[in-house]
Regions:
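ATP/NTP phosphate-donor binding region
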Residues: 1-49, 64
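Gly/Ser/Thr-rich loops at beta-strand to alpha-helix junctions
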Residues: 3-7, 51-59, 76-80
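ATP/nucleoside-binding phosphotransfer catalytic cores, i.e., glycine-rich phosphate-binding loops
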Residues: 36-37, 188-271
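Short coil/turn connectors at secondary-structure junctions
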Residues: 45-48, 67-69, 112, 123, ...
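Short, acidic/small-residue loops that bind anionic groups at enzyme active sites
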Residues: 61-88
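Short, glycine-/small-residue-rich phosphate/pyrophosphate-handling segment
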Residues: 78-117
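ATP/pyrophosphate-binding catalytic subdomain of soluble kinases
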Residues: 103-207, 211-216
Length: 271
């Protein structure tokens, strides 16, 4: 795909001559579908591992390609939960030992859950971290910050270090680590959550319950917008029905620590 900053070409020019580098010739329309298409092409070309540079949205777009290739998601922004902050050299090394078969992929990676959004029985979107149901009737700037407009929240897991909507679920006194369904509003408790970097909000929570796998939950709000991983993407009308389902078959994510540990123990770095 287009690389206006020439990150890949500069990196390739400084690498060993015996490493073959192929650049994908794909058209860009400046939307998240560019990442989905690029991932699809890589899968077709037989990629053994993919490194993603971006945030939750970038990885969500890659997941749309039906990725069954291990991912090394590297965070390049703020307010992210799915990708990790890691030094690029070690991330690339982990991807290398996975791609070359130097380690057992199943032993050094985890199949992450995700949330599917269905409207009137058709899958319209997915989220890797959270789905927020907002009373706001239009998409607008897409990014969702106003907690007062949130009716309910679905999370794929309880992530203690999360920022954003998922931090609300992580601030609850719960023992589960998997999916959770949270209804916001009066009548319950209030939690302090970092919904934006550097800022904490007091959020009223009416109730919460575990979100079992493969059991669709109907959205209670009759009209409004659905935000996936922090961005509004779908408008729902009064004559429509929306459901959120937690599924197990999300992206397979490489643990950089486990991959490098396994490679080292196997003598992969001995020269």
């Amino acid at each position: 795909m287009p690389d206006s900053l020439q990150i890949t070409s500069v990196a390739a020019s400084k690498g060993p001559d015996d490493i073959e580098v192929e650049f994908l010739e794909t058209q860009s329309i400046g939307k998240e579908s560019d990442s989905t298409h690029a991932a699809s092409v890589m899968i077709e070309r037989g990629a053994s591992c993919m490194v993603t540079l971006g945030g939750d949205g970038t990885n969500r777009a890659v997941a749309f390609a039906g990725v069954d290739v291990p991912l090394v998601p590297v965070s390049t922004g703020t307010n992210n939960v799915f990708p990790v902050l890691v030094e690029g050299t070690t991330a690339g090394l982990a991807a290398g030992v996975v791609a070359t078969g130097a380690v057992d992929v199943a032993a050094v990676s985890t199949l992450r859950p995700m949330l599917e959004v269905h409207v009137d029985g058709t899958r319209r979107d997915l989220a890797l971290i959270d789905v927020a149901i907002s009373r706001q009737p239009y998409l607008g700037a897409r990014a969702i910050w106003d907690v007062d407009q949130i009716e309910e929240l679905f999370v794929s897991g309880v992530y203690p270090t999360s920022i954003g909507m998922a931090s609300i679920a992580a601030s609850l006194p719960v023992a589960v680590s998997e999916g959770l369904h949270v209804r916001l509003g009066p009548g319950g408790i209030a939690v302090s959550a970092p919904v934006t970097p550097g800022m904490f909000s007091t959020v009223p929570v009416a109730e919460w319950s575990p979100l079992p796998f493969d059991e669709p939950k109907t959205v209670s709000l009759s009209s409004g917008t659905i935000a996936v991983d922090g961005e509004r993407s779908i408008v729902i009308h009064a004559n429509q029905s929306a459901e959120i389902t937690l599924v197990r078959d999300g992206p397979r994510v490489v643990s950089i620590d486990r991959a490098l540990t396994a490679a080292g123990r196997a003598g992969g770095f001995v020269r």
